[in-house]
Amino acid sequence: MPVNYHQIESRLPEYGKRMKEFETALAQAEPALWEQFTRLDEDVAALRAKIEKAEAQLRRLYCAKPVSEPLLTHKAAPLPPAGYTLIAADGSQIVPNRHRPVQFGVINVGLIQARLGSGTAPEVSIQSTLLDPEELLNPEGNLIGEDEVALYRDFAERRALLEAALAAQAPVIALTDGLLDIYQQYSAPQLNFQADMRKIHQQLEARGVISAGYVDKPGAEMLSRMLDLLHTPETDLIAYDDQKRSLRGISDARLLAKLLTVPGERSAVFETVSKGAAQTSLKVHFYYINISLGNTPYLARVEFPAWQIGRASCRERV
């Protein structure tokens, strides 16, 4: 069905006006949010205690939790080792469609593997898999959709990374394009990959593989969620609903761009708190890093397993 461009065009002036008002409101709210963030710089223990109390009381919560560094930490990212194996995975998929005469689904996983410092060319491989016929239907007998196929793809990426990492020369850094872990959604309860994901993470940990997820256009608002929770009276915690928070639209990257002004600098390390619709098999930490090559900050988010903090050999390479 084609778009009614005339109808859209007639609404553009009003839409532009409302969007400008929205952006103005965000710009006015941002200094107050930054002031809250800076004021809590050294209160890491108190912040953790408040968030952990909320975790114990709430069924649903999604926010950042500081680990140990002050909130205003900004430091140069560690240098990579002289020689290491870098493995990165990215995937794509074809979703079943009831308008096709034959139903099928395809999972595509691309791997690039490079031995840095060796002088050899990177190796590229592609693994393409058809979903089995029984995998195309959900428990109700309907065709699976984008969410379910994305879970199959995400799991295939992690499995391919594990297989490549176990055969690679150490030290190994394994990168996922996007979030580090698979978040099990209620929309696809039949695809419970959590047990298998735990096994993958355990094998990577036993091998000492430095695994990380790289998000190059982060839009998460985990820090503003954290600040909103912290300013909720403890007597009101039991009824707290982060979906009803008053301030939305200021991402972590937008907030921290004031702090990470030098290319190569990273932020403090935070822990991902996730309870509710998005279930995870892994305790994930993350930081933001300025990857800009110029004067304007461009922030990416790097996620990694919490266990890497406890190993000096891994901690200095994350």
PLM segments and residue spans:
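A short acidic, glycine/proline-enriched capping/turn motif at secondary-structure boundaries
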Residues: 92-95, 181
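Glycine-rich oxoanion-binding loops at beta->alpha junctions
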Residues: 125-148, 152-155, 161
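Acidic, metal-ligating active-site segments
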Residues: 94-139
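Long, contiguous domain-sized segments
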Residues: 1-79, 84, 146-173, 178-317
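Short hydrophobic beta-strand that contains or immediately precedes a catalytic carboxylate
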Residues: 86-89
